[in-house]
């Protein structure tokens, strides 16, 4: 059942734009087994699944390279792929490996990304540099979604998305995630925007980008580590089948509307909201003192919170597992022909 809740950078990916007829044609070519740019390497298992119409779920790799310490990051990456397989879909973790865009990683590649300290954090604007210079790195939400969309994958799962940063009136700091979510045909499943952000303005920006925000069994926007931000969202959806029906309706109508599914962390897994806000304010103050800014800000704040707020890593693991389970369920309900 679907009901209204009560409430008053860069477009290029090796020459492809998400949401465009070019990308759709590329994705169709992938499914037919035709050639694609040599820098765009789709694992054989993933390519076969796309050709046969087997559900595929895309996963990011920045959480492996920059989100958690080793070996927790590697264990989590392997477990997430296992959840996808158990749910009846094929996992496709995205990354840059030696200048190649990878859709689906081997065990050795996951190990390398989890262990290496020198790998980059790669957003959409960084992809051409990484390809040209032969870099390896973890792909952000925006870059992962670009890649998944270009490959013809219909569901992408992450922990939390980026958004509008606090103090945006002083520094115009808005994540690349938001416009990419707005353009992509591939839907994004997450636990809301990261709680370190300006969540109200993030929701407003998503509306400006014509993103349909769905609350999975919730009337309010989830806030990553915290279950309830208190900010109402317009559409509550109580089943994966309803989400799949909405996606199919959008696609039949050929609407250029991104879809963001927000899945709140379980109440038993969330961190204490009051303690969270106290530690967050301390982290923001320290970041300002050390002049941390740009794409370094989110990893800095999250690392500070992991160190100073008990239960953060456990909450992060719990929420992304829940998101992957939901995303896999949605993927298996969608048509993949």
Where are these regions (language model features)?
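Glycine-rich nucleotide/cofactor/substrate-binding loop typically near the N-terminus or early
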Residues: 61, 66-68, 74-130, 252-268, ...
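General beta-strand structural signal in soluble alpha/beta enzymes
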Residues: 57-59, 91-96, 137, 155-160, ...
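A C-terminal functional module that forms or caps the active site or interfaces directly
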Residues: 257-319
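Active-site glycine-rich loop that binds ribose-phosphate moieties when present
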Residues: 138-141, 169-182, 187-207, 240-245
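Anionic-ligand binding region
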Residues: 227-251
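Solvent-exposed alpha-helices and their adjacent loops that cap or buttress functional pockets
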Residues: 48-51, 56-57, 146-150, 155-157, ...
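Short Gly/Ser/Thr- and charged-rich N-terminal loops/segments
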Residues: 6, 17, 25-30, 60
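N-terminal glycine-rich anion-binding loops that anchor highly charged ligand groups
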Residues: 48-61, 69, 87-95, 295-300
């Amino acid at each position: 059942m679907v009901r209204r809740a009560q409430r008053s950078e860069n477009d290029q990916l090796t020459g492809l734009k998400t949401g465009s007829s070019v990308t759709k044609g590329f994705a169709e070519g992938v499914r037919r087994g035709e050639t694609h740019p040599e820098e765009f390497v789709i694992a054989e298992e993933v390519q076969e699944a796309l050709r046969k119409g087997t559900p595929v779920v895309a996963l990011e790799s920045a959480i492996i390279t920059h989100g958690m310490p080793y070996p927790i990051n590697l264990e989590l990456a392997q477990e997430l792929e296992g959840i996808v397989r158990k749910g009846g879909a094929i996992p496709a973790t995205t990354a840059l490996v030696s200048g190649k865009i990878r859709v689906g990683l081997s065990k050795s590649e996951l190990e390398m990304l989890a262990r290496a300290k020198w790998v980059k954090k790669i957003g959409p604007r960084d992809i051409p540099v990484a390809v040209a210079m032969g870099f390896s790195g973890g792909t952000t939400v925006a870059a992962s979604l670009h890649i998944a969309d270009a490959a013809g994958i219909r569901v992408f799962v992450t922990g939390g998305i980026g958004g509008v940063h606090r103090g945006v009136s002083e520094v115009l700091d808005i994540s690349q995630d938001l416009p990419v979510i707005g353009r992509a045909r591939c839907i994004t499943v997450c636990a809301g925007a990261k709680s370190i952000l300006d969540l109200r303005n993030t929701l407003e920006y998503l509306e400006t980008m014509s993103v349909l925000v769905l609350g999975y069994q919730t009337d309010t926007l989830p806030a990553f580590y915290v279950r309830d931000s208190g900010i109402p969202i317009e559409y509550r959806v109580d089943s994966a089948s309803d989400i799949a029906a909405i996606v199919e309706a959008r696609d039949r109508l050929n609407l250029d509307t991104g879809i963001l599914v927000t899945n709140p962390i379980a109440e038993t897994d969330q961190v204490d909201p009051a303690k969270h806000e106290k530690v967050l304010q301390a982290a923001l103050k320290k970041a300002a003192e050390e002049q941390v800014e740009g794409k370094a800000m989110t990893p800095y704040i999250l690392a500070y919170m992991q160190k100073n707020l008990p239960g953060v890593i456990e909450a992060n693991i719990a929420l992304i597992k829940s998101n992957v389970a939901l995303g896999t369920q949605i993927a298996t309900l969608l048509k993949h022909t």
